[in-house]
Regions:
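Short, surface-exposed "cap/lid" segments of acyl-processing enzymes
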Residues: 17-78
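The feature captures the conserved acid-bearing segment of alpha/beta-hydrolase catalytic domains
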Residues: 149-224
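Short, surface-exposed basic-aromatic patches at helix termini and helix-loop junctions that form
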Residues: 57-60, 127-134, 210-214
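Hydrolase active-site cap/lid region
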Residues: 126-164
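Alpha/beta-hydrolase fold nucleophile elbow
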Residues: 106-118
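Alpha/beta-hydrolase active-site loop
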Residues: 82-104
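Glycine-rich nucleophile elbow surrounding the catalytic serine of serine-hydrolase chemistry
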Residues: 116-126
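Short loop/turn segments at strand-loop or loop-helix junctions that form parts
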Residues: 45-47, 66-72, 139-143, 191-195, ...
Length: 225
């Protein structure tokens, strides 16, 4: 008998990958209606705590991959990177994308775009180049984790569970990370609230925009009320 809370796992579009330690990442793959082997791929990375099931979002002209990061403290997410400073979640995400491409029979030059919100925005920026994305849309992304006002307002324990107690600053602050990326960066679409949590806009999205300006990297910025 299927437990009701896990009933979504019986969906024929739902699959999983696992690593050598038995850690599993579940995902839903919704193929495009026409020519999925050549259709672009849209990878959706959810935010903190949105882990009850993969989104049912689909597009007729796009292949949609919707994984779940239910790792980290309380199973609410590990920022699409890992647990206690490892990179296990990041590696599983790469396996999800690779398995999806194999199932779709995707062409080698298939287009990949990533959308992520909040925690997912961090994950989209972090994993964009590694996954070969041409564009990343990050909605209200976290850029700096530990040491930010957002961290001190209640998120510190979740960040520590993902990054460890002595985090690598390359991954604690994506302003540092993006400067280490070799090769071409994706086109960044950044969306931020005009009025949000204290210091969030300036410490997060706007600090990243300053870094992109410094690096002379192209981007699109949208500030919404």
């Amino acid at each position: 008998m299927i437990v009701l809370a896990e009933e979504w796992k019986s969906d024929p579009k739902v699959h999983f990958v696992s690593n050598s330690n038995g850690k599993e990442m579940w995902f839903r793959l919704s193929p495009a209606k026409v020519n999925p082997e050549s259709a672009p791929i849209y990878l959706i990375l959810h935010g903190h705590g949105t882990t009850s099931r993969p989104t049912l979002y689909a597009e007729k002209d796009w292949n949609v991959i919707a994984p779940i990061d239910n790792f980290g403290l309380d199973g609410k997410g590990s920022w699409w990177i890992g647990e206690n400073g490892d990179f296990s979640t990041r590696e599983l995400l790469a396996s999800v994308v690779q398995m999806s491409k194999e199932m779709l029979g995707s062409n080698d030059d298939v287009i990949l775009c990533i959308y992520g919100s909040s925690m997912g925005g961090y994950g989209a920026i972090l994993n964009g180049t590694k996954l070969g994305a041409i564009a990343v849309y990050a909605n209200v992304p976290q850029i700096k984790l530990l040491g930010s006002t957002y961290s001190e307002l209640g998120m510190k324990k979740y960040f520590e569970a993902a990054l460890g107690l002595n985090p690598n600053e390359t991954f604690n602050d994506l302003n540092n990370f993006v400067k280490t990326v070799e090769g071409e960066l994706p086109l960044f679409f950044i969306c931020e609230n005009r009025f949000g949590q204290r210091d969030y806009r300036e410490q997060q999205a706007m600090s990243f925009i300053s870094t992109l300006n410094e690096m002379e990297v192209n981007y699109h910025l949208e500030i919404v009320p």
